[in-house]
Amino acid sequence: DLARREADIAVRGIPKHKRPPKDIVGIKLGRISLGYYVHKELLSEASRSQRELTCIRASGRALSLGDLPDPESLGLKSRHLIDGITPRTVAVTNKLGVAALPCFLAKQYPDLMLLPGVPSAHWGYVWLLHHKDLRQSARIRALFKHLSALEEKWPNCWDTSLDNARRAA
């Protein structure tokens, strides 16, 4: 917790419509996109009517879907409520259902794929943050200067949304 001075810096994903708190200073490092991911075997079983595709949801407090459609509009029943990116990822990799996951995380699991017909969507940004009282710290300034210079080289895998693909073209 930066506000309580439990750390000098923090890396956070913040939705695109929000900003860091007033007493926290930061820079955007890159864009994050979300997508509905499913295990390839579960999708195959569902296409053969052997299993039903259901959605693993997060509570509204834990995850905003951003521009992704609601699971119900995709015909997915919500069967499980799991807060936390890591537990939801584990659930999807174990074929429990479909879940909205950050693309940079899901890409690390070759058995996961985007739900067909539902493109990923820009969700927010990765921010590097520090408390405003550390603005004069030489090591904080040096780190932020170095990382902001790398911004153009930041991984595109964090944002696989269509608008990012259009910008790159």
Task: Please annotate each region the language model reported.
Residues E6-I14:
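Pocket-flanking alpha-helical
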Residues R135-A149, W154:
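Short amphipathic alpha-helical coupling segments at ligand-binding clamshell hinges
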Residues K40, K132-L134:
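Residue-level signal for short, function-critical loop segments
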Residues G13, T89, I140-A142:
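Hydrophobic alpha-helical segments, especially transmembrane helices
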Residues L129:
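Short hydrophobic/aromatic beta-strand micro-patches
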